[in-house]
Amino acid sequence: MKLSKRIENLPPYLFVQISKKIAEKRAKGEEVISFAIGDPDLPTPKHILAELCKAAEDPANHRYPETEGLPVLRKAMAEWYEKRFGVKLNPDTEVLPLIGSKEGIGHAAWCFLDPGDVALVPDPAYPVYAISSQLAGAEVFYMPLNKENNFLPDFNAIPQDVLSKAKILWINYPNNPTGAVAGLDFFKEAAEFAAKHNLAVCHDGPYSEIAFDGYRPVSFLEADGAKEVGIEFHSLSKSYNMTGWRIGMAVGNAKMIDALRRFKSNLDSGIPQAIQLMAIAALNGSQDVISQNCAVYQRRRDRLVEALRNIGMEVTAPKASLYIWAPVPEGYTSASFATELLDKTGVVVTPGTGYGTSGEGYIRLSLTVPDEQLEKGIAKLANFKSQA
């Protein structure tokens, strides 16, 4: 049987590879402490689970859901956005619930790109931006994110011949993997750049509620002109510890939202209705979980930054996101450091090159590690230094 070229050319997904390595080590009876994947270890709040249990018992929720989501859910999403960011959205035309924001990111490439078009993708970045664009038949132009520019793309460095074919601009702040943040000035610049070059902006903002030291991330849609050129993907996964329930949203430009809705309606049958009702409970209920999460992650951030500095790594504490972006010690590449750390200590980190060539020289560490495991990992890092 011959597979399609798009599948044959598809690289292995980074986090699947990491999970396999972890499983192999554990199968040998070796202890593994993984800082590799940003999957919250904290539980979904009880009042949200209670709504799920109640909804699951109602036979009305056992049938096919509406692809575009319950009207009451879209209303809750719009109200949450206005309350959190001051952004007004029409729940009927500017809000689309998703089976996790990753679904919408994957679909967006098919909605806004044709074969031969160019997608402008940050480097380093969440791999799905580039992979989904390539699956849609587009070429990818990588925009380097460098420390010298605060891990923001330099739009002026994009060649004119690339811009003439570019159709989509991917951006993501607070950023994965760098932990960098962006303000309204940058988002306004992005919106103006997109308007000038007729680009569709897709901003991925799932980490807006994970922030530290009093910092409050902003939404791309708060910037003047943003809704005219783009959409924002958001997720309940990180904010409410709901990665396993798979629910997110796309909001913003009505034409782009309609395109996603049309594409989605032909590929899936929507989000299970009980999970939609669960999401309403999350958005409309107590938001205490968000501040509680941030307190836990900030404590872990501080412990891990201290531990990394103690082994000679010049680490900047992130203002937001679930990640620490750490430069590797002199004499190592990203991959060689990650490999040696795993082999000698059982500590798993993600090499920066897994997110793009501009990630060379860095590793990413996640804060979603239970406190006991975190302390074991810190002890192993100290032991690694003593062996070096």
Swiss-Prot record:
In the record, biological process GO terms are: lysine biosynthetic process via diaminopimelate, diaminopimelate-aminotransferase pathway
Keywords noted in UniProt? Aminotransferase, Pyridoxal phosphate, Transferase
State whether keyword Transferase applies. yes
Q: Oxidoreductase among the record's keywords?
A: no
Q: PROSITE patterns, alphabetically?
A: AA_TRANSFER_CLASS_1
Requisite cofactors: pyridoxal 5'-phosphate
Known EC number(s)? 2.6.1.83
Which pathway is this protein engaged in? Answer: Amino-acid biosynthesis; L-lysine biosynthesis via DAP pathway; LL-2,6-diaminopimelate from (S)-tetrahydrodipicolinate (aminotransferase route): step 1/1
Residues annotated as binding pyridoxal 5'-phosphate are 101-102, 126, 176, 207, 235-237, 246
Q: Which residues are recorded as binding substrate?
A: 13, 38, 102, 126, 176, 364
Q: Which residues are modified to N6-(pyridoxal phosphate)lysine? A: 238
Q: Which GO terms describe its molecular function?
A: L,L-diaminopimelate aminotransferase activity; pyridoxal phosphate binding
Q: Where is the signal peptide?
A: none
One Pfam annotation, family name?
Aminotran_1_2
Which reaction(s) are listed as its catalytic activity? (2S,6S)-2,6-diaminopimelate + 2-oxoglutarate = (S)-2,3,4,5-tetrahydrodipicolinate + L-glutamate + H2O + H(+)
Top EC group: transferase
Q: How does this chain assemble?
A: Homodimer.
| Record's function text | Involved in the synthesis of meso-diaminopimelate (m-DAP or DL-DAP), required for both lysine and peptidoglycan biosynthesis. Catalyzes the direct conversion of tetrahydrodipicolinate to LL-diaminopimelate.
Family statement: Belongs to the class-I pyridoxal-phosphate-dependent aminotransferase family. LL-diaminopimelate aminotransferase subfamily.
Name used for this protein in its record: LL-diaminopimelate aminotransferase
Name the source organism. Answer: Dehalococcoides mccartyi (strain ATCC BAA-2266 / KCTC 15142 / 195) (Dehalococcoides ethenogenes (strain 195))
